[in-house]
Amino acid sequence: MKRKMKLSLIENSVSRKTTFTKRKKGMTKKLTELVTLCGVEACAVVYSPFNSIPEAWPSREGVEDVVSKFMELSVLDRTKKMVDQETFISQRIAKEKEQLQKLRDENHNSQIRELMFGCLKGETNVYNLDGRDLQDLSLYIDKYLNGLTRRIEILIENGESSSSLPLPIVANAAAPVGFDGPMFQYHNQNQQKPVQFQYQALYDFYDQIPKKIHGFNMNMNKDSNQSMVLDLNQNLNDGEDEGIPCMDNNNYHPEIDCLATVTTAPTDVCAPNITNDL
């Protein structure tokens, strides 16, 4: 396994010269790849204690050509990206500090977000927070509300609104079925918004009406029609007194917009299986 080399001056002169030769060869190879792959102009001048004559890459003429083109540039263009080792290290440190601060801000925002939802759920007591946390929480809530407001404005601009959302449905104990009868309106003093209710059909009740009429006419006399009307009204009143149970345990009594009026005559009663003895 290749061990990591310590970045410091090599004390042994023989090892230092060997390392210099290998690294110089690797550097020139990288420069060749850079020029070929990226299409840039590059050169290198190497001074070393192992050779009295400076080494130029790719050649002395090539170095002079690149240097002359560089010197023709303005001072601003020449120094725009020119750094030494100290400046390069300082830039790296500043970049790492900026990244670290960004991560700290993200962690802080996550903590404030959890704190906000904890307060809404009742899991966090705001009286245990210090002044700085309360201030950060207030700022985050304002920012969160502004984001929600902006989202609503965008939806309105796109033609959407809250009225397009389905109304809440109060579920009944039994399975909901259709109802084709008169309209009912329910009033609750604690109810501020209209709620869509589901009604149970009264088909069973209306199915019993012919049976009751048939029973009345089995022993019909002069006051048979009057007895039938009284019995029907009694059944309707019983249904009103029961009310309709809902989820909030309140019995809503219907306010009937229109009721059918039952009008009977002694000689004009029509019902199945009725024998008129008058």
Curated annotation (Swiss-Prot):
GO terms for biological process: positive regulation of transcription by RNA polymerase II. SMART domains: MADS. One of its GO terms (cellular component) is nucleus. Gene3D superfamilies: Transcription factor, MADS-box. It is found in: Nucleus. The keyword Transcription applies. Residues 1-60 form the MADS-box domain. InterPro entries: MADS-box/MEF2_TF, SRF-like_MADS-box, TF_MADSbox, TF_MADSbox_sf. The keyword Nucleus applies. Induction: Repressed by MEA in seeds, and by PKL after germination. Interacts with AGL61/DIANA and AGL62. Probable transcription factor involved in the development of gametophytes and seeds. This is MADS-box transcription factor PHERES 2. It comes from Arabidopsis thaliana (Mouse-ear cress).
